[in-house]
């Protein structure tokens, strides 16, 4: 389902209660936003309270998109991840009572590498390929700027996913100092 429709409905419900909400989306929704793949739910960072949970639940019920154990918009990522700085995020949608931000794909890459799950490693490879990242050193430095502690073996693995083993072997031959 088009998330923009859900965000518009969420804004309408927030406006009825005179509540303003800012969210920073991460995970699958950001991949969907950049046309990489779809997702069912929206993981986001936001200030949660009972009123906001109730509004999110209502919108999800109205559109039939809540999962049995999880609302369509949830901030469970806040338990395991650091929030991206708003200064690196772009405004994806802006309504009267709702503003939706997304971090750059390079930040999502860091989150995917940190998780280490199979699906996330594949997503990380897809991000590298989409953004046409060609430097392991640049990725490592950027992730460190964001506060991640990148694992070189994981970075090498996702570059292999993105470009193949031949490309990676050639890169390592041409840039031996980057891997020390």
Report the location of each language-model feature.
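Compositionally biased terminal segments of proteins
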Residues: 1-180
């Amino acid at each position: 389902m088009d998330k923009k429709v859900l965000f518009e409905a969420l804004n309408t419900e927030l406006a009825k209660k005179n509540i303003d909400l800012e969210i920073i989306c991460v995970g699958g929704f950001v991949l969907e936003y950049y046309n990489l793949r779809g997702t069912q739910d929206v993981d986001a960072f936001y200030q949660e309270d009972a009123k906001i949970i109730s509004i999110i639940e209502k919108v999800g019920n109205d559109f039939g998109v809540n999962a049995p154990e999880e609302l369509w918009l949830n901030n469970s990522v806040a338990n395991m991840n650091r929030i991206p700085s708003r200064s690196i995020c772009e405004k994806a949608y802006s309504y009267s009572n709702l503003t939706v931000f997304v971090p750059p794909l390079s930040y999502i890459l860091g989150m995917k590498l940190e998780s280490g799950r199979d699906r996330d490693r594949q997503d990380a490879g897809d991000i590298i390929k989409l953004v046409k990242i060609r430097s392991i050193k640049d990725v490592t430095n950027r992730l460190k700027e964001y506060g991640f502690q990148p694992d070189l073996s994981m970075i090498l693995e996702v570059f292999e996913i993105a470009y193949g083993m031949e490309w990676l072997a050639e890169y390592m031959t041409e840039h031996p100092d980057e891997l020390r």
